[in-house]
Amino acid sequence: IQSTSMDQGILTEDSMNSFIRTLIQAGIWKNKVPKQTARTKDGMQTTVKKTEAEADAMASKDTRLGFQPVVSVDAELLRQQRRFSSPRVLLSENTPLEPPPLYLTEEPMVLNRTSRRKREGKSHRGEYSVCDSESRWVTDKSSAVDIRGHQVTVLGEIRMGSS
């Protein structure tokens, strides 16, 4: 399982408890369903399954004593427990077809971008800002200088469609 973002959400205590209960119910916790031996009135021994509360108490006792349970988890069970807070996270069992986008290297000829880069961090390839030195929209200009220093014409209106 691979993640393409470091923006994974933190699991809450309730979701972790739910996950552990699922493991216990599936018989995966310690690779068996916990059982205990009980005596009936006639002295015969019977095997009785522990309740969920008793299993949780035993697990917490084992943790306090330093025992780490061996857990083998099926991939399908983990697939059901994915909980991330960001839609930008993509999990896949396959390797990505291409590497992640590269960061632009610092270019010495780029003007007026030093303070902006410090504020916003490095920009990704193909991501350009419309206006670097002003923090408001400019609507009355017919020409401008782009980030590479070239003179460009600013379109007052963009027509879309077949007109």
From Swiss-Prot:
This protein's record includes keyword Signal: yes
GO MF term list: growth factor activity; nerve growth factor receptor binding
Positions of the pro-segment in this chain: 4-119
Keyword Secreted: yes
Main location: secreted
Gene Ontology CC entries for this record: axon; dendrite; extracellular space; synaptic vesicle
UniProt name for this protein: Neurotrophin-3
GO biological process, alphabetically ordered: cell surface receptor protein tyrosine kinase signaling pathway; modulation of chemical synaptic transmission; negative regulation of neuron apoptotic process; nerve development; nerve growth factor signaling pathway; neuron projection morphogenesis
UniProt function note: Seems to promote the survival of visceral and proprioceptive sensory neurons.
Biased composition (Basic and acidic residues): 123-133
Leader sequence segment: 1-3
